Structure formats: C-alpha cells, structure tokens
Amino acid sequence: MKTFALILAGGQASRMGGEDKGLALLGGKALIDHVIDRVRPQVSHIAISTNRNLEEYARRSPHIFPDARQWQHFGPLSALCTAANDLQLAAADWLLVVPCDMPYLPDDLVARFETVSKRTPLCNAYYVETPITMHYNIMYIRPQILQSAIPYLFSGMKTLRSWLQQQRARPVRFEFDGHFADLNTQIDLQEG
C-alpha cells in the first residue's frame, strides 16, 4: 500500500507576524524539517504545498506546488483543490495530510490510520481526534476524493470540518494531545 504525504505550508502565517511558518525555527531547525523527520519514515513520498520561498522548500522535496491562482487564500482547502489535479499524488493509495507547524507528530500516525482503515474499508477519509479536540487538518484520505474539494470550495464553503463531514470521514482516536500541538506564534516557538 502506497502512502504519500502532503505537508501544508502555504498559509499566510498572520499569527506569526507574516513569517513563513514552515521556515520558522524551533530549536535551531525549521518547523517543516521537524514535520518531515516525523513523517518521512511513515510514507513513501512527500509533497509540499507552499505559496512562497519555493526554492527553499524544493531543497526539502522536489515535489512542491503553490495553490492554483483561483484557489489562493482559502486556507488548507486551496492546497487540496490544487492537489486534486496532481497526477503524482493520484498514484498513492492513501494521502496523509499534515500542517507544517506540528513538529511532534507521533511515529505511528500512519500505522494507526491504516489499522482503522482496514477495519472500515468503505471509508475514504479519517482525521485525528484527541481527548481535547478534533484535528481536521491532519487527514488520511484517498486521493480520489480530492476532486470533491473543488465544487465544495466553489460553492462558498471553506472549512475542512464540513468538507470532511461531507466525505463521511471518521475520527481516529489518539490519547496524547501533545503530539498535535500546533506552533502558530513566536511565543509558541519559544515555549515549544
């Protein structure tokens, strides 16, 4: 089974003062490098969605792409709509989607998603649930459902939560919320 990863690094980083969040440093290392180190052993390919510093991100993965112009500034759904037309991603059986600002992702993230997907083979989308909250921006999805994000976004809808609900996505429970801490501000980075 081929699982690819799509790392979302295309946001405006308004809470980070406009600094490119994926390249912000945590312990002397870019946030995206922490994320790549966590997911690389779990997947066979990594793609990065980013809208700036393309050359810098290309050093980390040759498979990078910006949001298509018509979908820019619609958050993570912009990346999903653009990815819907990416033939390389379409070759995967599953796509792990994670943001660039979660440096503590668990080493068994894909294994846990795979286990649940084998028990529920008709389900095409999963997301993380912890005792504290739902993390809709961490998804394990069939690449074929990405096409449905396009009419969803054109209809004026913009949230991952309702798109995942439309896909009848199921939560996968993780007990330790600390794995999913997102570092959105400079203060978060200092405390991280």
Curated annotation (Swiss-Prot):
One of its GO terms (cellular component) is cytoplasm. Its main location: cytoplasm. Transfers a GMP moiety from GTP to Mo-molybdopterin (Mo-MPT) cofactor (Moco or molybdenum cofactor) to form Mo-molybdopterin guanine dinucleotide (Mo-MGD) cofactor. CDD domains: MobA. Pfam families: NTP_transf_3. It is an enzyme of class 2 (transferase). This is Putative molybdenum cofactor guanylyltransferase. Keywords: Cytoplasm, GTP-binding, Magnesium, Metal-binding, Molybdenum cofactor biosynthesis, Nucleotide-binding, Transferase. Its EC number is 2.7.7.77. GO terms for molecular function: GTP binding; metal ion binding; molybdenum cofactor guanylyltransferase activity; nucleotidyltransferase activity. It is found in: Cytoplasm. Monomer. The lineage of its organism: Bacteria, Pseudomonadati, Pseudomonadota, Betaproteobacteria, Neisseriales. It catalyses: Mo-molybdopterin + GTP + H(+) = Mo-molybdopterin guanine dinucleotide + diphosphate. Mg(2+) binds at D101.
